[in-house]
Amino acid sequence: MSLLTEVETYVLSIVPSGPLKAEIAQRLEDVFAGKNTDLEALMEWLKTRPILSPLTKGILGFVFTLTVPSERGLQRRRFVQNALNGNGDPNNMDRAVKLYRKLKREITFHGAKEIALSYSAGALASCMGLIYNRMGAVTTEVAFGLVCATCEQIADSQHRSHRQMVTTTNPLIRHENRMVLASTTAKAMEQMAGSSEQAAEAMEVASQARQMVQAMRAIGTHPSSSAGLKNDLLENLQAYQKRMGVQMQRFK
């Protein structure tokens, strides 16, 4: 796996699923391929994206700044600086300085990532902030190692939280989660269907599913009534894709 592929993988792992994630993936691909060279416009676009947490925006801004060539005097962006200040916690800053001293002696991506993984996400973000604000300089490979370690820490905690929700025995939470997943699957079907004539059927199925979820929410239903809703939708989606000649091995 190439270095940039690895960076893209880690960064995208902390971006919430949805149309915005696809857009960010495209931007990252363009940046890494050297197709997008306007850092100013890229940062302005990132700043105004909804849904993303300030820290995720900060990490993306850091990656864009590392990758896109820019004039030496280009102004640092406040939204990235604020996100990478470790919540203003002096302990995070102390640890970030210690980590920075270790990273300065490192030259490889994997070496930097290994060192960084023993620090908390707050200290890692602060260390990125030091580098972003030009208070410290490391090689681009080392900076990417720091980025990937930070994303791994965040993705780990997101995964723990997600696992807790998925394994919860509370029927109300499970019911709502199934309806949310069905709704987002329906939305994805509508987007994939596009405007072709064969898409009418998929659009119809998706629309019915969304209306059903809205009705279930409006009138209140038994927690088991949503069981199988998402799977039914996915089966419809896969049947539609087969007819369209699109093969999607793993959607579930």
Curated annotation (Swiss-Prot):
Main location: virion
UniProt record similarity statement: Belongs to the influenza viruses Matrix protein M1 family.
Biological role stated in the UniProt entry: Plays critical roles in virus replication, from virus entry and uncoating to assembly and budding of the virus particle. M1 binding to ribonucleocapsids (RNPs) in nucleus seems to inhibit viral transcription. Interaction of viral NEP with M1-RNP is thought to promote nuclear export of the complex, which is targeted to the virion assembly site at the apical plasma membrane in polarized epithelial cells. Interactions with NA and HA may bring M1, a non-raft-associated protein, into lipid rafts. Forms a continuous shell on the inner side of the lipid bilayer in virion, where it binds the RNP. Determines the virion's shape: spherical or filamentous. Clinical isolates of influenza are characterized by the presence of significant proportion of filamentous virions, whereas after multiple passage on eggs or cell culture, virions have only spherical morphology. Filamentous virions are thought to be important to infect neighboring cells, and spherical virions more suited to spread through aerosol between hosts organisms.
Record's subunit section: Homodimer and homomultimer. Interacts with NEP. Binds ribonucleocapsid by both interacting with genomic RNA and NP protein. May interact with HA and NA. Cannot bind NP without genomic RNA.
GO CC annotations, alphabetized: host cell nucleus; membrane; virion membrane
Native organism taxonomy: Viruses, Riboviria, Orthornavirae, Negarnaviricota, Polyploviricotina
Membrane topology listed for this record: Peripheral membrane protein
Protein name: Matrix protein 1
A Gene Ontology BP annotation from the UniProt entry: viral budding from plasma membrane
Membrane as UniProt keyword: yes
Coiled coil: none
Key word Membrane present: yes
Domain of life: Viruses
Pfam families: Flu_M1, Flu_M1_C
UniProt short sequence motif Nuclear localization signal, positions renumbered to this chain: 101-105
InterPro entries for this protein: Flu_matrix_M1 (IPR036039), Flu_matrix_M1_C (IPR013188), Flu_matrix_M1_N (IPR001561), Flu_matrix_M1_N_sub1 (IPR015423), Flu_matrix_M1_N_sub2 (IPR015799), INFV_M1 (IPR037533)
GO molecular function, one term: structural constituent of virion
Region (Membrane-binding) residue spans: 1-164
RNP-binding as annotated region, ranges: 165-252
Location of the protein in the cell: Virion membrane; Host nucleus
Extra facts: Most abundant protein in virion. When expressed alone can form virus-like particles in transfected cells.
Keywords, in A-Z order: Host nucleus, Membrane, RNA-binding, Viral matrix protein, Virion
